[in-house]
Amino acid sequence: MEGAVVKMEKQGKVWLVGAGPSDPGLLTLKGKQLLEQAQVVVYDALVSAAILAMIPNDAELIYVGKRAGNHPVPQDQINQILLAKAQEGKRVVRLKGGDPFLFGRGGEELELLAAHHIPFEVVPGITSALAVPAYNGIPVTHRDYCSSVHIITAHSKKGGELKINFPALCALEGTLVFLMGVTSMEMGCEGLVKAGMDPQMPAAILQEGTSAVQRRVVATVSDLPQKAREANIQAPSVLIVGKVCALEKTLSWTQNRPLDGVRVVLTRPKELVSRMAYRLYELGAEVIELPAICLEPYAENPQLSKALSHISDYQWAAFTSITGVRVFFDFLRKRRCDLRALSHLRFAAIGPGTAKELEQHGI
């Protein structure tokens, strides 16, 4: 109708993103890009602090828990949160540990969105069923040992029996990977032995895999529950049963790094933390970026203004940090200063990072 104003409602969208296991380096590139653009992030307990540090400060974070035996926010309520935020027109990332479609209830969360015609995408994550054994020197398949791998949830209601066909698993002769397996480990190992598995079959329980503090206990399937109790193995853990577990001593690689087992919190400004974080990560540390410093240049800097007005009186310009270089040249740019006025100066830089920053400005 002529003269009428049509109001277009903004359409929100949900991305179901698998965060992978603990190591932030295993997050997919697409997952990282989506986190950096998110307006709302709904996340589980198993998402590492290092990954959460990638989220913009202005994004809304909604914690929904979901550890074994502890679900503070019911699944139906999580579904409603996603729907409500999308209906507000927000870019919503639903961030789940591992892969969202492997025992992650991701399908349930998307069904409600589909019913309300909310657009969504799925970004697969690296599952702990593969990454955790790999970080412990256990290949889930090996030509000389097995040609199949089978992933089973070992989660059951408190006090309930496992609904697993143990005889069928024993007949498969492949590697068995049980997720959420700590509380049900004893029932699982006993069930396999009673179903005919060799009691001397190698098995391993892997705690907090891919993190700097990961631990493992390797034994036979009959002895593993007792040895795991003695080692005080806790959730989250992955249970592996199969001949490939015998390779862990030969193929273990994470324990050889100098900072293995160390967690490091970096409090530097977010824009300066990446290089140091990468170096620590390469040495085996688990790096958590927790910026506690925010650098803001003075709106007016009378001392710098005065120095620049008498720049011909100076012979040296010395910089002690990358930030100092950036603030200085930003100050010049905003005031449209002629850089040729600096041509007589000699420049000094403390540290290679500061020197490299000067090089970016042609110095």
What are the roles of these predicted feature ranges?
Residues P133, G137-H155, I363:
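Short, glycine-/small-residue-rich phosphate/pyrophosphate-handling segment
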Residues I62-G65, P124, M201-T210, I288-I293:
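Beta-strand->loop->alpha-helix junctions that form or flank phosphate-binding loops
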Residues S22, P74-I78, S211-I363:
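Signature of uroporphyrinogen-III synthase
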Residues E2, Q11-V14, Q77, Q87-V92, ...:
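A contiguous loop/helix-start segment that scaffolds small-molecule binding in enzyme catalytic cores
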Residues A49-A50, A68-N70, T127-A131, S148-I151, ...:
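Short gly/pro/ser/thr-enriched loop/turn and capping motifs at secondary-structure boundaries
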Residues E2-P24, L29-I126, A131, E230, ...:
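Class I S-adenosyl-L-methionine
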Residues G125, G181, G351:
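Short, conserved phosphate/pyrophosphate- and ester-handling motifs at nucleotide-, phospho-/glycolipid
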Residues K32, E108-F120, N136-R143, K194-A195, ...:
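A glycine- and small-aliphatic-rich helix-loop capping segment at beta-alpha/alpha-beta transitions
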